[in-house]
A protein has these predicted regions:
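Short amphipathic alpha-helical segments
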Residues: 19-21, 93-94, 207-209, 316-319
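A short acidic Gly-Thr/Ser loop motif
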Residues: 8-14, 84, 187-188, 195-202, ...
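Long, charge-dense
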Residues: 103-124, 231, 236-253
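Nucleotide/phosphate-binding catalytic cleft detector across ATP-hydrolyzing
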Residues: 1-14, 18-193, 269-272, 294, ...
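Short acidic/histidine-centered micro-motifs embedded in hydrophobic/aromatic stretches
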Residues: 176, 246-247, 306
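Helical "lid/coupling" subdomains associated with nucleotide-phosphate turnover
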Residues: 44-52, 58, 172, 182-184, ...
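A structural motif specific to WD40 beta-propellers
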Residues: 31, 214-216
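Amphipathic coiled-coil signal-relay and dimerization helices
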Residues: 90-92, 206, 217
């Protein structure tokens, strides 16, 4: 018997949803993927129009449900939700527990330390993840070395409100920047690797070293800014996006006086590449500042790019020069067996969620009450009005119960703090 689960990733340029079958062995098989634009409803990862976001959620899940019904499944009425927003970042925390006389840190002590981190209460913030970097003993105390993934409460609450409006149960809120780290190898996590998830409006900076996450920041800057710059040359936004993807080269190759065909404007390739590279150099400068802030300047052995923006031509060359990292590669999700088309970098966040999705998201059939069954057996019929009332009473949406709490400092005041 297979389990049907579902995931929705709320990105900066698109909302992506997947329906997934899980067999008895725990293997995931993607049944369908659907995407829609976030324009007008989500900005920098935060919901700005609850009604419109809910409508797009309903539309996506209806499409997924129609796909899986061909295999005998029911409707999808729940989903895991992946979120990322500009307020999301890591924060060090050091919980402590008094040890017994043997001064031994066992699993029970580790669990107590982790629970303390989850229960940390700070006004207006959520804790979305806890990463342990180890423990040490100070006198008679076991002290945890934790990285908390935190964000403003409005980030997750906006998603909960939209899901409630769409009448879809939230199984769990997942911080996708933390999950995307699974695309790295153990060796990369051990030896200082910069992971850049490059979206339209957001760029997530994660630094891994000594086997785990050491630093995470989400910048409110993305590759959409390049599209806007190109559009100022007299192009529509969608045409500017196509020009950026198909012709732009951030490495600024020598193109002479060559121009792009099939355009109503005369835009030399050399000028286009200056536009593309200038904006990406600005992004690279901000990334470099965050590396310095994390005290990893000159200490990174490699860089891995993912996300839709990572496919920009010439980007690896530009970042190699700007960040002084020689080993740079682009990668999609590879930690679960998927079709090659599902491994593309722009789907990495969605695909990275799936190994964490284990609960059924399939709507349960509505059972008839004993009284209703008896009435049918006696050959009597209820009025349409009564039937509608019974149906409304029978179908109840489960309550959304997500734990709240967490911390993140004022974004722009904290973003560049400590950088000379």
């Amino acid at each position: 018997m297979k389990t049907l689960t579902a995931a929705i990733q709320f990105g900066s340029s698109r909302i992506s949803a997947a329906a997934v079958w899980i067999d008895k062995s725990g293997h995931h098989e993607v049944a369908s993927i659907e995407c829609t634009s976030t324009e007008g409803c989500i900005r920098h990862g935060c919901v700005v129009n609850n009604e419109e976001t809910a409508a797009r959620i309903k539309s996506l899940l209806k499409k997924l449900s129609n796909r899986v019904k061909a295999n005998g499944a029911g409707d999808i009425d729940a989903a895991y939700c992946g979120i990322c927003g500009m307020s999301m970042q890591s924060r060090e925390h050091h919980p402590s527990v008094l040890l017994d006389e043997d001064l031994r840190i066992g699993q029970e002590v580790k669990s107590q330390l982790e629970q303390q981190s989850w229960e940390l209460q700070l006004t207006g913030k959520d804790i979305l993840g806890v990463c342990s970097k180890g423990e040490h003993i100070s006198e008679q105390l076991a002290v945890g070395d934790h990285q908390l993934i935190v964000a403003e409460s409005r980030l997750a609450q906006g998603i909960r409100n939209a899901m409630e409006r769409a009448k879809v149960r939230v199984v769990k809120i997942l911080p996708t920047p933390l999950l995307v780290g699974d695309i790295l190898t153990d060796e990369e996590k051990a030896n200082g690797t910069l992971l850049l998830d490059m979206g339209a409006q957001l760029t997530t900076i994660s630094i891994y070293d000594k086997g785990g996450l050491q630093f995470l920041r989400v910048l409110p800057l993305g590759c959409e800014s390049v599209t806007r710059d190109i559009a100022t040359m007299g192009l529509r936004s969608d045409d500017a996006e196509n020009v950026k993807k198909n012709w732009g080269d951030a490495s600024r190759p020598d193109t002479g006086s060559e121009t792009m065909p099939h355009l109503d404007i005369n835009l030399p390739l050399s000028e286009l590449n200056i536009i593309v590279s200038s904006r990406l150099e600005e992004l690279a400068m901000n990334i470099d500042l965050q590396i310095a802030r994390a005290n990893y300047k000159g200490r990174l052995s490699s860089c891995v790019l993912t996300g839709g923006g990572s496919m920009q031509k010439g980007l690896t060359s530009l970042l190699s020069k700007q960040l002084n990292i020689s080993k740079i590669s682009t990668r999609g999700c590879n930690n679960i067996r998927f079709m090659s088309s599902e491994r593309k970098p722009h789907l990495t966040s969605l695909m990275s969620m799936l190994s964490y999705c284990t609960e059924s998201c399939e709507a349960k059939p509505v059972e008839k009450t004993e009284g209703e069954s008896g009435a049918l057996a006696n050959g009597t019929n209820k009025s349409k009005e009564t039937a509608k009332t019974d149906s409304a009473q029978e179908v109840n949406l489960p309550n959304n119960s997500e734990k709240k709490g967490g911390f993140v400092s004022s974004f722009f005041n904290d973003l560049f703090a400590g950088v000379d």
